[in-house]
Amino acid sequence: MVRLREIPRTAAFAWSSGPNPLLVTGTRSGAVDADFSDETKLELWELNLDALDQGLELQPVASISTESRFYDIAWGAPSDEHPRGVVAGAMEDGSLQLWDAAKLLAGEEAVMSRDTKHTGPIKALQFNPLRPQVLATAGSKGELFVWDTNDTSTAFRLGTAAAHDIDCVAWNRKVSNILATGSAGGFVTVWDLKTKKASLTLNNNRKPVSAIAWDPTNSTNLLTATSDDNTPLILLWNLRNSQAPEKTLQGHDQGILSLSWCQQDPGLLISCGKDNRTLVWNPQTGERYGEFPEATNWTFLTRFNPGNPNLVATASFDGKITVQTLQNTNASVAPAAQTNTDDDDFFAKAPTELQGASFSLTRAPIWFERPVGVSFGYGGKLITFKKNDTPAGQPRSSKIQISSFSVDSDIGSATEKFEEAYKRGDIGAICDSNAADAQTEEEKADWQVLKALSESDGRTKILEYLGFAKDDEASTSPEETEVAEPKEEPKETGLAPPQPNGDDAKKKHKRVTSMWGDLDEGDDFLSDLTPAKGAKTDQPFQLLGEGNTTEDRVTKAIILGNFEKAVDICLKEDRVADAFILANCGGKELVDKVQTSYLAQKKGTPSYLRLINSVIGKNLWDVVYNADLGNWKETMVTLCTFAEPSEFPDLCEALGDRIYESGSRQDASFCYLVGSKLEKVVDIWVVELQEAEQAGLQEASNDSTFSIHARSLQHFIEKVTVFRHVIKFADDEKELTEGWKLGSLYDKYTQYADIVAAHGQLAVAQRYLDLLPTKFPAAEVARNRVRLATQKVAPQAPQVAQRQTGPISRAASRGPTPMGYQQPASIPPVGPSHTNPYAPPAPVQPAASSSNPYAPSTTSQFTPAGASPYAPAGYAPPHPAPGGYGPPQTFTQPGAPAPPPPRNTGPPPKIHKDPGSWNDVPMVTRPPVRKTTPSVAPITAPFGAQAGLQSPLPTGPYQRGAPTPPPPPPKGSAPPRSVTSPPVGPPPAGPYGARPASVTSNTPSPYAPPPAAAAAGLPSPMVPPPAGRTASPYNAPPAGPPPSNRYAPAPSAQPYGQGPTPTPLAPPPANPYAPAPAAQQPMAPPPQQYTAPPPQASRPPVGPPPMSGPPPAAGGPPPAARAAPPQQTPPPPRAAATPPAARHPAGDRSHIPPDAQRMVELLSQDMQRVASKAPATFAPQVKDTQKRLGLLFDHLNNGELVRPDTVEQLTAIAEAIAGKNYDAASKGQMEIFRDKVEECGQWMVGLKRLISMSKATP
């Protein structure tokens, strides 16, 4: 509740019905102001909720004096004559006065009429909600009048005079002629104005009726309240069956004075009364939602605002009218520290708690509920809901529909068409289709190139695309390639001329790569010059000439076979042709030498020589960087013809860069495509994508911006996808964390995945998201959305699911309980805990939800939920020896019923000790919870779970009796909200509980429980005095609810020889730093008979093993004779024990099953996190938790104790802890403990502590 405004008046009030909330107040009859003023006023107040500078306390906007005080006041609806409505006052002097609200605000004379038909005070009045001009008034002696505010002289009376006053009146909200009244005599009368007679009377058991409220939706439902302090009840009546109320709402401590049933939501009701409280209810279910901040005096009137039910006003006799909101979800402010330090005062140890004013409705009010709604869902889903028509009073329901939705159906169909063709591998069809539909020449050229690259002979197709097909050589004229040959007349010399072969006669157009390296034609030429034996010619020649000429030096080198020297001589003399002829005889190295020398002399002129120089020298970079861009196509053909495959992509990229820098984007795109440079061509395509979107927006079409963008992006993705497929692209940057060359492409993939997912094609979206790098910024969110939308919902694990049933006793499934064993108690479902995670332990019952995970474990491994994870406590063995540290017992005949335990009570001794650092500020705090002072239930059996049964254990003379419940404090008009711990006997001081009587202390508090007399059945000298506290860690844990004062003595423990006192579940401590309760022993002491009976059910009871025989009986008088016990069947002989399997050493984790490794990892990580952040004071507790978790891991490593289904439950708990869902983790832990006790070894306490510590650790 947020307190918005306060009106400093003790007055009756009414809300205006206009849009701006106004309040009218009239001085309340029967109240005295703080200054004892007798002035009576009618005042108007404006809330000014929108004014930020408006203070909490208001000032009236209009005020007039009246002759009498008000019992009640009402504000009618506006009308044509009265635009602000009419204010009616029920006056103490018996008059009915009417004022015009508009004139009151204007400061004019506002009195409309004053009528005195009533002979006594008018106690109540109300306007008819269906006929605003009709007003009903009720008062003393049973007087009931109905008025017409337009003509008050026509008022008529209903009924006759009666002995009792009518204190309340209410019009039916559905039938305008039905009126109900409630009298101080306890009768509720329903009137019918058509007949002007009472049609029905409800008997309220003679209890005065103080308030009536009609159901806003059901005309036959009626609420009544009584102001009787003994029976402060709200009754819900159904007039169809008026013999008894249909429901009873009980929650007030004293009489109820006012009711207000919300007109907009029949599930909301507000009541207030003499207990100073204002409660919020659901009258249809009887549930109490919460409570407004408590006043310091009676709250006599409360009302919803009729136009804005979020606002509620409540008037009280403490002189305030409070305007506040219906609910507040913020945490309440912690109460101030207590200053009372009187140790003798009972309430000093139980400080009064200021009740928190925060609660949330369990359901949304109807005015917040939408009758119809729609929402887009991820994956192309459209979710719509609408409210079903339900009869009045029936639970409301809604219908939800999930349908598919597509922003642009063309986008979805285009995506499906492309994906189908791509899966078939029909790349050519995709290219042809897109080329035909291309909007620009650039786009068409891209698809044509992609188709050419997709062919098996891609380079050949590129050459054809550029217009350089190989077949063009056939069209070359023979004259261009013929070489003129000299004609010589053959002479008859006997030398036969060579016969040319038909193939050799054809002129070959060799590739340029074999221009100099292929010497086949030269070989053929020389071979044609074969010598003929005996051939003689008439052309003699000299090998050597006269002198040292060039020819002579060359000839000498030739005849010596030194062709290299001959070549050098020719090159020196610039005889290049002769050098080539000689180089053919000397080998390829000489040929290359001559080529190099020749090309160096020509210096690239003509151009074909520079080109051939680049080809021969395998240096095509000269062509790429220096060739004129006007011949880029010829350059590309040269690269396709001569470039090595390893250099070809880089050469194409370099050529494309030159072209792109010159401004020809389309030609550059071609080069990038041919060179398989995806990162280069993508940047160009992104620019083309943006241009296509701009062009689409400028066109006069009905397409939306989204549709244009989606279609353009679809074409872009199709080109990229086909290109990746053609070049078999492998992305080597998926593992990088930044600096991606394809960053622009990844952005488009993300956009495209979002679009196709919005059209329901989640598998397609997932495929493109898989192409993104792992660390790409937008990839993680997109992947998670698709993964969550495509994954199947796993069935909810039973160990974490919320149980809808109430507490279920499991005793029936365990069979009869053998004598000496405690019947297992039912375990209630786990609720939220409000304990301090750093507080020391205090006792609760085993099923309580607020125990200490660090308290010593006794005979059970059970640790309730919500425990304090860092409370210092000594470590105790999980199964201590029975009776080892308790008082001795007197044993009687086995099986004999025990006498009732003696009663002995005493105040707990005061112990002053240094609390150390236990009260450090916790990491997590919770708002305090309002509690009442608990009382101790009487003991009807020695064991908490066997109420009404006699104890099977004998009671020894040294056993201490159960505590006597303390008397309640005197009841006042407004009892304080306080909590305390019931006094119980202190624990034994030594091993056997003996202690000198001089240590006993008495409590002089008037509210402390008196000491009880010695129980019957014990000799007077044997009554043991109360024992003092002890610091031994092996004493029994104390019993009782947690103390509310952190410095008050903690409740003491009972000795082991006595069964635990059945106390109610202890509520969580109100103080966030108060000691948290510790677990009480849920198991009974060991049986005290000679032999144990065999189990009577298929499932053995859980508890300590029976003793083989009783110890010797202790001294003391034996108890009286009892009935003989039933005969017991001896147990069957034990089977021979099998040798234990070999165990792996502790700490070994190499044999943990694979299905448990995830759980072990999560628990270990969270344990390390807690250990690193826990305060140093709680290091022993953290270490003990680590040790207990290690025991669990050892069990898993050895394949023992924990079954596979339990491992699944533990994995779910570990996942819940990792996800900080501690409520689910606690529920899962309780499920395992309840259903699989036999598997819960010492590790269960460690698991429970880890949940609590993890919850408390930020």
Curated annotation (Swiss-Prot):
The entry's keywords: Cytoplasmic vesicle, Endoplasmic reticulum, ER-Golgi transport, Membrane, Protein transport, Repeat, Transport, WD repeat
Topology with respect to the bilayer: Peripheral membrane protein
Organism superkingdom: Eukaryota
Sequence ranges of Low complexity compositional bias: 792-805, 845-874, 1135-1144
Matching PROSITE patterns: WD_REPEATS_1, WD_REPEATS_2, WD_REPEATS_REGION
Signal peptide region: none
Gene3D superfamilies (alphabetical): 1.25.40.1030, Functional domain of the splicing factor Prp18 (1.20.940.10), YVTN repeat-like/Quinoprotein amine dehydrogenase (2.130.10.10)
Skewed-composition ranges (Pro residues): 896-909, 963-973, 1035-1044, 1061-1075, 1083-1120
Biological-process GO terms, alphabetical: COPII-coated vesicle cargo loading; endoplasmic reticulum organization; protein transport
Region (Disordered): 470-511, 792-1153
Reported function: Component of the coat protein complex II (COPII) which promotes the formation of transport vesicles from the endoplasmic reticulum (ER). The coat has two main functions, the physical deformation of the endoplasmic reticulum membrane into vesicles and the selection of cargo molecules.
Subunit (UniProt): The COPII coat is composed of at least 5 proteins: the SEC23/24 complex, the SEC13/31 complex, and the protein SAR1. SEC13 and SEC31 make a 2:2 tetramer that forms the edge element of the COPII outer coat. The tetramer self-assembles in multiple copies to form the complete polyhedral cage. Interacts (via WD 8) with SEC13.
PANTHER family given in the database record: SEC31-RELATED PROTEIN (PTHR13923), SECRETORY 31, ISOFORM D (PTHR13923:SF11)
Protein name per its UniProtKB record: Protein transport protein SEC31
Native source species: Chaetomium globosum (strain ATCC 6205 / CBS 148.51 / DSM 1962 / NBRC 6347 / NRRL 1970)
Organism ancestry: Eukaryota, Fungi, Dikarya, Ascomycota, Pezizomycotina
